[in-house]
Amino acid sequence: MLFKTIFYQKLQKKVTTLFNLETERVIREIENLNKNNPKVIFQAPEGLKLKVEKEIEKIKQYFKQKNINIEIYLWGNTCFGACDLIDNHVKNLNVDLIIHYGHEKLSYANPEIKTLFIPAYHIFNKDEEEKILNDIKNFIEKHKSGGKKVAIATTIQYKKLLKDFNPSIILGCRGEVKEGDVILFVGTGRFHPLMIAYKYQKEVFIYNPLSKCFDKISEEEINKFIKKRILAISKLLLNKPKKVGVVLSTKKGQCRKRVFDEIIKLLEENDVNYLPILVDNISPDILFYDVDCYIIVACPRIVLDDYILYKKPIYTPEEFKLFLKNSFKYKFDEIKEDDF
């Protein structure tokens, strides 16, 4: 135990000041395998890959000093979220453990190989924490004085910091927010708050805990986006597609088989020819088929964020249903537990 304590004290001096990668927990999980020469794969999103690379070196050093053999690999492909599990990709390697950084386990995506999820909580010093929490409290009080309730949303990295505000945890593909008159998203970037804005079709305030600045996604921006998507749907009404590509992601947390089957049934009922396509990573360069458009049965953000990159029109399942119903009442598509 003394050796382990001294080792962790040394690690703490070197470890990143931005994210808590829970080195001790990872080492303990590997040791608990109680296996000679265990195989462990580390998986992380792009923003954490270089930090995890350094983390691997520290963990290798620990086991080397204990004279324990271990095989460690870094997953080099994508990691879009807890939906993007790799157990099916690596099962032929007889892997004992996967360390997945940056996300929490999804109830509808269960890995078949033992997987440890490390949230990678953001680390702030005391002054930074105080500044962040006071800024949020002042925002809440300001709107409370006007008779409005503020709902706080954030990503997993700030869950621990904001625990006293009981925040909703937002995923890229889902935007469930507790009831409130005003929504404040705490986090970096616009990817996650856009999800909330699209779903609730109302402005979302943003507080960036790194820059300590406020921003917002306006109703004007949301309405502009919805108009673009309705225009895309209306083009289907003007030129009814003769053949449609129906793309189903094979990623465990995006493989919405029930939705896929529902779309196929609707196409058959409406006498529309279709080509079912199975894909892991959906991107513009692999959708080159002789179809008029594609229905993307996967993460809805592929359509909502990247539609302009595709040569042929792409639609979410909900958008294509609007076309079949001849409706212009836009309905946002998001992944739900009963999609699988």
Curated annotation (Swiss-Prot):
Q: Which UniProt keywords apply?
A: 4Fe-4S, Iron, Iron-sulfur, Metal-binding, S-adenosyl-L-methionine, Transferase
Instruction: Specify the enzyme's EC class, one word.
Output: transferase
Q: Which GO terms describe its biological process?
A: protein histidyl modification to diphthamide
Cofactor needs: [4Fe-4S] cluster
Pfam families linked: Diphthamide_syn
Q: In which pathway does it act?
A: Protein modification; peptidyl-diphthamide biosynthesis
Give a yes or no for keyword Iron in this entry: yes
Q: How is the cofactor bound?
A: Binds 1 [4Fe-4S] cluster per subunit. The cluster is coordinated with 3 cysteines and an exchangeable S-adenosyl-L-methionine.
Q: Please give the subunit comment from the record.
A: Homodimer.
Additional notes on this entry = Unlike the enzymes in the radical SAM superfamily, Dph2 does not form the canonical 5'-deoxyadenosyl radical. Instead, it breaks the C(gamma)-S bond of SAM and generates a 3-amino-3-carboxypropyl radical intermediate.
Return the NCBIfam families for the record.
arCOG04112 (TIGR03682), diphth2_R (TIGR00322)
Q: What is this protein called?
A: 2-(3-amino-3-carboxypropyl)histidine synthase
Species the sequence originates in? Methanocaldococcus jannaschii (strain ATCC 43067 / DSM 2661 / JAL-1 / JCM 10045 / NBRC 100440) (Methanococcus jannaschii)
Q: What is the lineage of its organism?
A: Archaea, Methanobacteriati, Methanobacteriota, Methanomada group, Methanococci
